[in-house]
Amino acid sequence: MDSTTLLYHLLDEGYKIEALSFDYLQRHRRELDSAKKICELTGVRHELLQIPSLTGSALTFDGDVPHGHYAEESMKATVVPNRNMVMLAHAVSTAIARGFDSVAYGCHAGDHTIYPDCRAEFVEAMRKAFALCDWTEVELLTPFLEWDKGQIARRGAELNVPFELTWTCYEGGKEPCGKCGACVERAEAMASIDAA
């Protein structure tokens, strides 16, 4: 939902886009199929990168996915150590190789509590790293950094994002579980569209 809305937001802003997805043997692999379909729908080039070395989280089958709201301490089990830094490193390398001057990252305020690599301090450190990692400086775009999930959902609704094609559930079944933190937060965000 976040990445798809980010894609539509950047297309609306006039950016030329290529999309990367990452297969880290995550439990919720359905998100990869969703990303492919959405990129086909929008005509955006999509590449799937393999990074199977990420482990140590309920999202990589190292324990059960906790149920409930993200604010709960148990949700820390869904942190994949250093995941976003690894993904951003791959993204900046790909951007430089392909002549892009920016990388977009869909982090948002709703993730700040649980995920250290979605916080402003992390983003600022990555911006500095992007400026120093190569002769070519690459800008890190984070338009949703201070937005909550409801704001992202409402922006997506404005852009006619096909939310029905997106996948959010951490369980990875055939249907969303409706109980994991990702499902709970998505339901609240979607309800905010109707309330607006």
Across the structure, where does each feature detected by a protein language model lie?
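ATP-dependent adenylation/nucleotidyltransferase module used to activate substrates
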Residues: M1-N160
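Local cysteine-cluster metal-coordination motifs and their immediate loop/turn environment
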Residues: A89, L165-E188
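Glycine-rich nucleotide phosphate-binding loop and flanking beta-alpha elements
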Residues: D111, M190-A191
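Short cysteine/histidine-rich metal-coordination sites, predominantly Zn2+-binding motifs
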Residues: G172-G173, D194-A196
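Flexible, glycine-/basic-rich loop-and-beta segments that form/coincide
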Residues: A187, I193-D194
